[in-house]
């Protein structure tokens, strides 16, 4: 268990180090809990959250009991991309926060990639 958490932390720090080099672009950050998925677009130069979406939003909340799945991740990706475009954000850098690029993370990224550039 400790080695899995250690691998996660190493992956997370490696990703954050690469993202820190691209300070001129906004960051699309994701977080997964046991029941929900959260995505937010952050401007690191101003330390401000530009837009956010999650399975707690009213549009997605009433669909299913289980919220942390691929189907809802695609809807969150589309929703966060729409909010980003409406706020004037065209290009972001994807911060997967140490999670492997598979399943829910991949579905969210692919859905968001249809409207905004990574």
Curated annotation (Swiss-Prot):
GO terms for biological process: translation. Pfam families: Ribosomal_L18p. Coiled coil: none annotated. The keyword RNA-binding applies. GO terms for molecular function: 5S rRNA binding; structural constituent of ribosome. It comes from the Bacteria. This is Large ribosomal subunit protein uL18. It comes from Rickettsia bellii (strain OSU 85-389). The gene is rplR.
